Amino acid sequence: MAAKEIIFSDVARTKLTEGVNILANAVKVTLGPKGRNVVLERSFGAPVVTKDGVSVAKEIELADKLQNIGAQLVKEVASRTSDAAGDGTTTATVLAQAIVREGQKYVAAGLNPLDLKRGIDKAVAAAVDALKTISKPTTTSKEIAQVATISANGEESIGQRIAEAIDRVGKEGVITVEDGKSLADELDVVEGLQFDRGYLSPYFINNPDKQIAEIENPYILLHDKKISNIRDLLPVLEQVAKSGRPLLIIAEDVEGEALATLVVNNIRGILKTVAVKAPGFGDRRKALLEDIAILTGGQVVAEETGLALEKATLAELGQAKRIEVGKENTTVIDGAGDAKNIEARVKQIRVQIDEATSDYDREKLQERVAKLAGGVAVIKVGGATEIEVKEKKDRVDDALHATRAAVEEGIVPGGGVALIRVRQAIRELKGANADQDAGIKIVLRALEEPLRQIVTNAGEEASVVVAKVAEGSGNFGYNAQTGEYGDLVESGVLDPTKVTRTALQNAASVAGLLLTTDATVFEAPKDAAPATAPGGPGAGGPGFDF
């Protein structure tokens, strides 16, 4: 085990605070509509230009071990806030720095750090309650666009794209962000349920222009095993042929004689069919087949459900208004499933989301909810260069997360004003002793910091603006984009309540831990390697001229 060094009390806290300040100073230049970019070096490829706080924080590793520990603690604030709310990482970093800075003064003056932390926690709890009181739900597409625009650093086109995507797929729908292939941003919306499996034979194609198979008003057979023997399929094929409607077969695989017979019948016009593989693998495949069955009003023909393929009837088949099958994707549009059954299935999957332990499982379950409840929208981010697309894509991701947070917990006035307003609820607070009162004062001062930084980044005098905003009430605040005072909600400067709440709670949590630290243990630096390698001068080896 490597040797460790231990640093105590003020020396440790001073070094940790230096690390906090180095990271926070790099991150906070990005805050607000007039915040600046930060350029990040990459070990390979082009550098990255970003205005995303957590991206900047993640890149920072300091040479000094003690300073680096402080920086990593604040990095944790940004990461936690990003994970929980998807935005607000810079605000969280600024708040953490302010709490640490103010707290250090009191600790140096001899106040009890644990009582300071208790006072901080008490003030933050009161601030969170006050935030919930002034929060209002997002009800209109315009408000959603405004939240997204603010999070995307004032770019209205991004806000409009996200609002349009939510309009199209609903609040439950999946919205993904991809690199585009043109200069402009594009929005693609997939209606209905889509899964990533295409036709098993190109002979199923009946729309050569689009290179897809389209079938109207089809029956849908769902089977969890391979189909290779046509005799197993014949009974259900005969029933579908009599009905005069087409058939989509979704199974683990369709091969050999069965696939050949389907292709021949399709070409001759005897029975219009399309066969595709079932999506997913293992248990996930079973779950996805069940989702499709509920959406289309059918049943999965499987041993587990007591149904045999050779005994399947039209009653077990699902139905839909239209099916589109491409080379790689199948889309089921307007399935005939019962709305109550679909709703029950969505609730069931939501319970699984709450219980999921891995991000991957949670993401896949959320995709299933979206496919059942809404749809899928893809925002393709355009730009002239790869660097521009990457930077813009980060902002679209932030805006998307902020929008979801706003839908979840509502909105408050932006521009740091909500944090100024909740100070009123903290002023009346009293701690159990004078040290706890000092902890409450730390939070009172720290709550000004996001507004101060926004104003500083806009090139104005922070103290003057903070004083004027504090004199006002409600939504009155400073719009850094226009340089004017007014009603921020009316002018569209909004923040999601969840983002503001999460930023404050995480900042106070980590800053409080840092203030109560009295010893730091870290790995001792290794001794420098000898300057002369073996076999060099004086080692007794032969001499060489180079």
UniProtKB/Swiss-Prot annotation:
Record-linked Gene3D superfamilies: GroEL, GroEL-like equatorial domain, TCP-1-like chaperonin intermediate domain
Record carries keyword Endoplasmic reticulum: no
Binding positions for ATP per the UniProt entry: 30-33, 51, 87-91, 415, 495
Q: What is its EC number?
A: 5.6.1.7
The biased composition feature labelled Gly residues covers 535-546
User: Which residues does the annotated region (Disordered) include?
Assistant: 527-546
The entry sums up its family as follows: Belongs to the chaperonin (HSP60) family.
Q: What is the name listed in the Swiss-Prot or TrEMBL entry for this protein?
A: Chaperonin GroEL 2
